[in-house]
């Protein structure tokens, strides 16, 4: 399955690859009628969206090496900048084998949801988009062996094609300021800090 949002394609389209011979999964139509695509889809496909998705795929393939390197540099700049300004953070996941545009950090004695709300001008998440309504900690972080408190203290930063150096620097400052404000209110942090 190809999600257009991951490659900056037009809204309203995606792609599903199904091998022709002996598919492992039997597909059922979502909407009956029309008989298009061997009875799996009804209605006419919007040709401009198909062309747009094709162009997005072409651009993603062509620009991937340079884009991945640039995004990786920004991710490292963000991580190192936050690490310099904010004590007691933890990188969630392996330091090496990671997607360039994904940074997940835990902040000791800070609730991830509260931190996210304290940084209204920085787009971050405390879980995946598909589980954003769930109050539970990230099942992925728990499966990685993090305890619930650490998982709840985590934020995910997503970087992409349109991320700028100025946004990285702004995010570093916003995270540092918000964590400092929240930790001042944290009994666990102030007790540990000796304040």
Language model: regions and residue ranges:
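Anionic-ligand binding region
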Residues: 14-16, 38, 78-82, 87-118
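A general structural signal for well-ordered alpha-helical segments in protein cores
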Residues: 10, 24, 47-50, 75, ...
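Active-site PLP attachment segment
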Residues: 1-29, 33-38, 42-55
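PLP-dependent enzyme catalytic core of the Aspartate aminotransferase-like
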Residues: 49, 137-195
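Structural signature of PLP-dependent enzymes
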Residues: 56-80, 90-99
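Conserved C-terminal alpha-helix-loop-beta "cap" of PLP-dependent enzymes
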Residues: 103-156
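Thr-Gly-centered strand-to-loop micro-motif
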Residues: 3-4, 27, 40, 93, ...
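Generic structural signal for well-ordered, non-membrane alpha-helical segments
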Residues: 42, 46-50, 64-75, 112, ...
């Amino acid at each position: 399955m190809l999600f257009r949002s991951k490659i900056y394609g037009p809204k309203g389209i995606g792609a599903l690859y199904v091998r022709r011979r002996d598919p492992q999964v039997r597909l059922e139509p979502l909407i009956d009628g029309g008989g298009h695509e061997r009875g799996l889809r009804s209605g006419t496909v919007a040709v401009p969206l198909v062309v747009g998705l094709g162009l997005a795929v072409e651009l993603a393939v062509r620009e991937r090496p340079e884009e991945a390197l640039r995004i990786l540099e920004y991710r490292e700049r963000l991580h190192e900048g936050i690490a310099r300004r904010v004590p007691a953070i933890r990188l969630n996941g392996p330091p090496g084998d990671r997607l360039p545009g994904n940074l997940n950090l835990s902040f000791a004695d800070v609730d991830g949801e509260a931190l996210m709300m304290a940084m209204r001008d920085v787009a971050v998440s405390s879980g995946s988009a598909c589980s954003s309504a769930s109050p539970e900690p990230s099942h992925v972080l728990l499966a990685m062996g993090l305890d619930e408190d650490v998982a709840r203290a985590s934020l995910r930063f997503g970087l992409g094609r349109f991320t700028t150096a100025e946004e990285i620097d702004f995010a570093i400052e916003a995270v540092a300021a918000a964590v400092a404000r929240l930790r001042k209110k944290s009994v666990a942090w102030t007790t540990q800090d000796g304040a």
